[in-house]
């Protein structure tokens, strides 16, 4: 009992100690105090149970203490029951975490303190990490070009030539001799303008810099160089890019990460703690004991740490929702950002390097997360460096130290308390009501520096970054830093296990098990794709079986070729069926690279499950095919031969999947992989022995037959069939019929060769999967470390490193400066527009409840995201839409802007008093989306000009339009990067903040009456945010209606708004009215609510407002802020205003435009062609690669079929079949390559098209026609390559008629394959489904082309498929024009002599007199597919919003 009293006293002391928590706002302190007292009361109740319960608990503890150490680590007491912490259920984990961390801000601190106190009580310390770096300099290679620095086809070719010549490249500095130190238990803030080198510094410290960068200097952890331990496992780098598997839920993502990162030193520490506790006779707190033991167990599928991280990151509410992507609805952008952070801190890393973790988060959520990080740093003695763009003052105050960077140099590195004194010593002072972080970033800017000059008696001169650096080195803080670094690290002060020496946290077996578990999960989530493939294969089996129906197939020489053709077709079909594996494998590569480089798992652990788990799928698909087609076609009816065929087909399908996975691992992008996959397919097929028999190959190329997996498959299948008893009839030559058929094809091998073939296929499968694992191991993520800059730009670089990179130049546009948000009076162009009010009443929005939520017990079929939202946005009024992450801000904007593609919308939305008509509303509104979707291959200036061209009315002449574009570019400060390529997010091109500013410019240039902006300042630093908001304010001042959702506004930015709509989680309004001077209206409204804490002096009103209206404050006060608002006079006034605005003003009329689009169709088409022309010219990965493919293909075909097209060289049916096979192969492979290449290219552009279509920029037909037309010049290049390489090498007739007929036919063929690829993308929701349907198209084309099964032999019930097959008309025109008029040349066919023309007509059914009709029909296919592409673009939208 004495021990119990001591424990109670200790808990009281802990509760009192918690009141000393640093830097917690008064509002949060009030909420936390209440929660803390509640928790204390609860624990006291637990302590005052009856003696029986106490004795029972003591007996259980005594029993646990008698267990061996390992068992004791796994056993604890939870809710008075002994439990195995490895087998805690989901409910138990959730209840325990809720009990430990009921209120995040206070209870998290309490939990960390209890853990630390428990360890200190027995003399155990956490290992710590100190990071030092000295004179670190990072340089990148750059390619200097004349003109604009863009990756055009020409620049790429020249760069490749220079690369081959190994000429040295220029170098640009990124970091310039930076030095510093990060200590344990310190939370450090990294500040600086975008492009100053913050990310590079974080990567350098985390040991994750690209190997192509030139790095000098030293980085040490606890005095050890990076190459003496594994920095990736000792520290964690948290990227600013959110890369996750879209099919996985939040919980699954975190569990997977926790499992692979392991528990680090937790297990050893826990073992030591419980050993010493046993020796000292100490009984720990049951909940703390359970928690600490649970997070110390390695390799668990479901981790307690996951539940804890989800709780403190605010992800518990979306735990069972999939992450999603641009085409799939998932968690919000803010939740995705928190998941990126949680994914790494769920591990045991002692040093954290965090890159812009607050992008997309509201200020209260950012404060909460940074507060938790502060607690982790201070209590757990972690070393944490965090880069933030716009930290609010209260968030800034949480940090201990500051690193301020500019131009790749460290301007200040030291205590936060000294930084203002340092700048005051330099002559600069931060004004009142100005955030310190905003001041620190702006005082370094040439444009903004002067306003902070405090020495009025002295003349101001711009203080350069170098001058600041010199001042810092001379300051006391700078000298202290030098002294600290001069003292060697004392290695006796830390445990040896602070640094990780193991690359992976789990055993090889556990790594494999975890990867298997994830692969199974992803296969379940993608079950639709695999089911579709099986159904497709079954359907094709039925079609094939009924084409080669056994009742039409005799066992004789004439029908032997059909049996041979059906076997070959089965092989082709199963090979082509593997194509969708390309899209699946490539789509997963970015996440794989991230996790591989974090040392989650090795490449082999990822590759083996991908291979093994696809084996059952291959077996199912092979059984489906064989069981349906085998007896329908009428192969040898012996059971053993059925299973022998099944085995070969199974191995071929497994090999196909392995091949395409291997190709994906080396090619990495969808476009390159498509070309690589088609090239591999081409080589395998050409050397496979069917299109060109082994005996017909040139002698010096016959070795190629033995390196093609298809050869062994063909040997196995044909031997299995033609060596059967029913083919033993003897022919006139004395050999059996079966042998004769095999000899004609060069496949005459003994029956035992079947098993050699099967073994060879197994060998190929293993080889390809080893190659896949090697590719995954050695290839770096896509993107390049080599910048492309212009010669003019490069000449401006200071060799001493004053300028940083092509996008780091600190030169500013010529705009007037005063207050950062003061209206810009100079040069403001105001184009004519109509001011409009948008009002909405009782708006509700419902979506179908996600399956994951229903599985967790949510009963309702519909999930309501907006609840009776009523409000209005008026001209000239700048309105802010705010709320915590997940409150429904973006949802409301989407609903008002008409961007939702699903769900149910209720309520009345009016524009100017008239019901909103989306088609006309799109003309007068702009929408800056959160996701920043742009065409990747055009420049910043071109993006803005393109938007202006299509969205400004025809009355605006081109000169005015160009001036307006220039002004918008300068206003948003895009002038320095106007020639930069936009690129793909996270891969290439613009940074996050540059991309955000481009989004705003693209919408502003449309001169809208109403403009919606979804988080326009998200991802921007304080200065860039001020620039953007000044531009937005200027727009509103011209009389436009402007609405912005905003997350982390500074006081200055927040008070630039006129009105505020505040929402709480669940989609309910809690405030809708004016801000007032210095936000007085908002402050007064909430301070009048009983219990709401008063705002402190100089505190950010937006942050205070979000804090006092959070869910925990509602729970503490026992109020519903939404209900209070509904009952307020403000709500009644707003309702009255909305009703008055819902009636049209006298003398006004509804919106009406004489045309649907701002520009005429001709102008739309002109603009679209202009953009597509630029995009294509700058897409070498698409156009150069497919041109290279055509070139190589032409050479390969030319060599293999050298002069076999010469009619004089054709003497029998095999010679004719060989050259016809050449035509068939040329057509098929060039066509498939075009189709496969265009699918990912169009897929990337599709989300841009959806945005532009919503904006009403152009008719979908204008875009479609431009897209279709833009392919023609590049197809012409392909045609010329075929005509001047393959045509003469193969030996086709050099007559004008035959030459131009061949050119016409190949042109139509290449175009219809291309347009089919475009069409299939526009008809399907994602690239995987598009690939499946494309592969079905290829296989049907194969079957119905008239080559494998000639038209006269196709059953009449399938002949319609033959006539609707584009490839059949291609071969018709090819065969007819080349050989259909050869009446003089006679050859031996099947034992008789016929003219070539007669054989073509009799065997294939191709008639020369019907050639014009065939030519016309052939030309109709590209036209048909192009029209269907246009229809799909105009009618379908697979985005889920």
Curated annotation (Swiss-Prot):
Q: Where is the ABC transmembrane type-2 domain?
A: 510-722, 1163-1379
Q: Which Pfam families match?
A: ABC2_membrane, ABC2_membrane_7, ABC_tran, PDR_assoc
An example Gene Ontology molecular-function term: ATP binding
InterPro entries linked to this entry: AAA+_ATPase (IPR003593), ABC2_TM (IPR013525), ABC_transporter-like_ATP-bd (IPR003439), ABCG_dom (IPR043926), ABCG_PDR_2 (IPR034003), P-loop_NTPase (IPR027417), PDR_assoc (IPR013581)
Tell me how this protein sits in the membrane.
Multi-pass membrane protein
Which residue windows are transmembrane per the record? 528-548, 566-586, 600-620, 642-662, 672-692, 758-778, 1187-1207, 1215-1235, 1272-1292, 1300-1320, 1329-1349, 1357-1377, 1413-1433
Annotated ATP 1 binding sites: 192-199
Similarity comment: family membership: Belongs to the ABC transporter superfamily. ABCG family. PDR (TC 3.A.1.205) subfamily.
Q: What is this protein called?
A: ABC transporter G family member 41
Q: Which organism is it from?
A: Oryza sativa subsp. japonica (Rice)
């Amino acid at each position: 009992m004495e021990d119990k009293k001591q424990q109670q006293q200790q808990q009281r002391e802990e509760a009192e100690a918690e009141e000393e928590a640093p830097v917690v706002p008064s509002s949060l302190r009030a909420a936390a105090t209440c929660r803390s007292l509640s928790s204390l009361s609860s624990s006291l109740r637990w302590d005052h149970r009856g003696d029986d319960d106490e004795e029972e608990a003591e007996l259980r503890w005594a029993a646990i203490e008698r267990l061996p150490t390992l068992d004791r680590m796994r056993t604890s007491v939870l809710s008075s029951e002994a439990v195995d912490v490895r087998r805690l259920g989901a409910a138990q984990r959730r209840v325990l975490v809720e009990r430990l961390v009921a209120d995040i801000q206070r209870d998290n601190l309490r939990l960390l303190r209890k853990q630390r106190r428990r360890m200190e009580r027995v003399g155990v310390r956490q290992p710590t990490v100190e990071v030092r770096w000295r004179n670190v300099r990072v340089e990148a290679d750059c390619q200097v070009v004349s003109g604009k620095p863009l990756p055009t086809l020409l620049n790429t070719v020249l760069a490749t030539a220079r690369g081959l010549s190994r000429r040295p490249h220029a170098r640009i500095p990124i970091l310039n001799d930076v030095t510093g130190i990060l200590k344990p238990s310190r939370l450090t803030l990294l500040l600086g303008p975008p492009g100053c080198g913050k990310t590079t510094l974080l990567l350098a410290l985390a040991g994750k810099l690209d190997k192509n960068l030139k790095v000098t200097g030293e980085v040490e952890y606890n005095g050890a160089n990076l190459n003496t331990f594994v920095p990736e496992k000792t520290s964690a780098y948290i990227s600013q890019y959110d890369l996750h598997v879209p099919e996985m839920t939040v919980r699954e993502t975190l569990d997977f990460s926790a499992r692979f990162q392991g528990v680090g030193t937790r297990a050893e520490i826990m073992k030591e703690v419980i050993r010493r506790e046993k020796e000292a006779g100490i009984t720990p707190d049951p909940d703390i004991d359970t928690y600490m033991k649970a997070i110390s167990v390695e390799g668990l599928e479901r981790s307690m740490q996951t539940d804890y991280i989800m709780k403190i990151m605010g992800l518990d509410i979306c735990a069972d929702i999939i992450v999603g992507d641009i085409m799939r609805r998932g968690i919000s952008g803010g939740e995705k950002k928190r998941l990126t952070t949680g994914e790494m801190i769920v591990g045991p890393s002692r040093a954290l390097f965090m890159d812009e973790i607050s992008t997309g988060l509201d200020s209260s959520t950012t404060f909460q997360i940074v507060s938790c990080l502060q607690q982790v740093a201070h209590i757990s003695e972690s070393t944490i460096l965090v880069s933030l763009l716009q930290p609010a003052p209260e968030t800034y105050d949480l940090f201990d130290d500051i690193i301020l960077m500019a131009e790749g140099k460290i301007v200040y590195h030291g205590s936060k308390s000294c930084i203002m004194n340092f700048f005051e010593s330099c002559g600069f002072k931060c004004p009142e009501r100005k955030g310190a972080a905003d001041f620190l970033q702006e005082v370094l800017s040439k444009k903004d520096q002067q306003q902070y000059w405090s020495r009025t008696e002295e003349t101001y001169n711009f203080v350069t970054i170098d001058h600041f650096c010199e001042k810092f080195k001379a300051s006391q803080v700078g000298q202290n830093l030098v002294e600290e670094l001069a003292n060697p690290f004392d290695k006796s002060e830390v445990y040896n296990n602070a640094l990780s020496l193991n690359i992976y946290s789990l055993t090889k077996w556990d790594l494999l098990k975890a990867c298997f578990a994830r692969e199974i999960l992803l296969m379940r989530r993608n079950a639709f794709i695999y089911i579709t493939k099986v159904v497709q294969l079954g359907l094709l089996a039925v079609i094939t079986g009924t084409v080669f129906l056994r009742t039409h197939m005799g066992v004789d020489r004439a029908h032997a070729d059909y049996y041979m053709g059906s076997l070959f077709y089965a092989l082709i079909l199963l090979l082509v069926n593997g194509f969708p594996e390309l899209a699946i494998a490539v789509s997963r590569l970015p996440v794989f690279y991230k996790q591989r480089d974090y040392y989650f798992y090795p490449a082999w652990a990822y590759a083996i499950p991908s291979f093994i788990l696809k084996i059952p799928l291959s077996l199912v698909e092979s059984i489906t095919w064989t069981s349906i087609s085998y007896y329908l076609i009428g192969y040898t009816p012996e059971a053993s031969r059925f299973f022998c065929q099944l085995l070969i087909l199974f191995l071929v399908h497994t090999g196909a999947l392995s091949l395409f996975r291997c190709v994906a691992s080396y090619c990495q992008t969808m476009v390159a992989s498509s070309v690589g996959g088609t090239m591999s397919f081409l080589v395998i097929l050409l050397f496979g022995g069917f299109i060109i028999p082994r005996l017909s190959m040139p002698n010096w190329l016959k070795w190629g037959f033995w390196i093609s997996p298809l050869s062994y498959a063909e040997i196995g299948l044909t031997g299995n069939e033609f060596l059967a008893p029913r083919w033993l009839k003897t022919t006139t030559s004395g050999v059996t019929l079966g042998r004769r058929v095999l000899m004609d094809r060069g496949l005459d091998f003994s029956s035992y060769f079947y098993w050699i073939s099967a073994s060879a296929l197994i060998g190929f499968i293993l080889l390809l999967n080893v190659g896949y694992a090697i590719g995954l191991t050695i290839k770096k993520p896509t993107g390049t470390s080599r910048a492309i800059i212009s010669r003019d730009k490069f000449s401006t670089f200071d060799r001493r490193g004053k300028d940083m990179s092509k996008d780091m130049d600190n030169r500013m546009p010529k705009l007037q400066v005063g207050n950062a948000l003061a209206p810009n009076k100079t040069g403001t162009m105001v184009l004519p527009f109509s001011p409009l009010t948008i009002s909405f009443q009782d708006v509700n929005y419902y979506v179908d409840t996600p399956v994951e939520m229903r599985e967790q017990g949510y009963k309702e079929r519909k999930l309501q995201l907006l609840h009776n939202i009523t409000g209005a946005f008026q001209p000239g009024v700048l309105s802010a839409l705010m709320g915590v992450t997940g409150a429904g801000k973006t949802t409301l904007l989407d609903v008002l802007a008409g961007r939702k593609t699903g769900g149910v919308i209720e309520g009345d939305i009016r524009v100017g008093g008239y019901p909103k008509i989306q088609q006309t509303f799109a003309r007068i509104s702009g929408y800056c989306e959160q996701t920043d979707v742009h065409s990747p291959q055009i420049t910043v200036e071109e993006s803005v000009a393109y938007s202006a061209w299509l969205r400004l009315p025809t009355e605006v002449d081109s000169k005015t339009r160009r001036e307006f574009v220039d002004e918008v570019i300068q206003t948003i400060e895009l002038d320095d990067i106007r020639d930069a390529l936009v690129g793909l997010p996270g891969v290439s091109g613009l940074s996050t903040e540059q991309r955000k500013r481009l989004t705003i410019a693209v919408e502003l240039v449309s001169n809208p009456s109403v403009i919606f902006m979804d988080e326009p300042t998200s991802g921007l630093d304080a200065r860039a945010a001020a620039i953007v908001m000044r531009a937005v304010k200027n727009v509103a001042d011209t009389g436009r209606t402007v609405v912005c959702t905003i997350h982390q506004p500074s006081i200055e930015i927040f008070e630039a708004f006129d009105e505020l709509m505040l929402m709480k989680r669940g989609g309910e309004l809690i405030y809708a009215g004016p801000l007032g001077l210095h936000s007085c209206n908002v402050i007064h409204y909430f301070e009048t609510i009983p219990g709401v804490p008063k705002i402190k002096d100089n505190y950010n009103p937006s942050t205070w407002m979000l804090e006092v209206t959070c869910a925990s404050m509602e729970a503490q006060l026992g109020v519903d802020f939404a209900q209070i608002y509904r009952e307020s006079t403000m709500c009644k006034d707003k309702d009255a205003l909305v009703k008055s605005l819902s009636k049209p003003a006298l003398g006004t009329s509804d919106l009406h435009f004489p045309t649907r689009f701002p520009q005429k169709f001709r102008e739309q088409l002109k603009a679209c062609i202009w953009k597509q022309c630029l995009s294509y010219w700058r897409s070498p990965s698409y156009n150069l690669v497919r041109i290279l493919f055509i070139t190589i293909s032409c050479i390969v075909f030319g060599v293999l079929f050298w002069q076999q097209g010469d009619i004089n060289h054709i003497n029998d049916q095999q010679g004719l079949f060989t050259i016809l096979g050449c035509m068939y192969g040329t057509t098929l492979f060039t066509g498939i390559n075009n189709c496969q290449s265009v699918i990912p290219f169009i897929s990337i552009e599709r989300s841009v098209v959806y945005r532009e279509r919503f904006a009403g920029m152009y008719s979908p037909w204008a875009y479609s026609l431009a897209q279709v037309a833009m392919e023609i010049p590049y197809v012409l290049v392909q045609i010329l390559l075929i005509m001047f390489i393959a045509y003469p090498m193969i030996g086709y007739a050099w007559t004008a008629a035959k030459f131009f007929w061949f050119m016409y036919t190949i042109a139509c063929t290449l175009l219809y394959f291309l347009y089919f690829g475009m069409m299939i993308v526009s008809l399907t929701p994602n690239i995987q489904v598009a690939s499946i349907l494309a592969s079905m198209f290829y296989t049907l084309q194969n079957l119905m082309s008239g080559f494998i099964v000639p038209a006269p032999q196709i059953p009449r019930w399938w002949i319609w498929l033959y006539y609707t097959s584009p490839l059949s008309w291609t071969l018709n025109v090819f065969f007819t024009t080349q050989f259909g008029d050869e009446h003089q040349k006679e050859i031996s066919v099947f034992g008789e002599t016929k003219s070539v023309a007669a054989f073509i007509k009799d065997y294939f059914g191709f008639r020369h007199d019907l050639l014009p009709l065939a030519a016309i029909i052939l030309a109709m296919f590209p036209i048909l597919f192009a029209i269907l592409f246009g229809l799909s673009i105009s009618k379908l939208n697979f985005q889920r919003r």
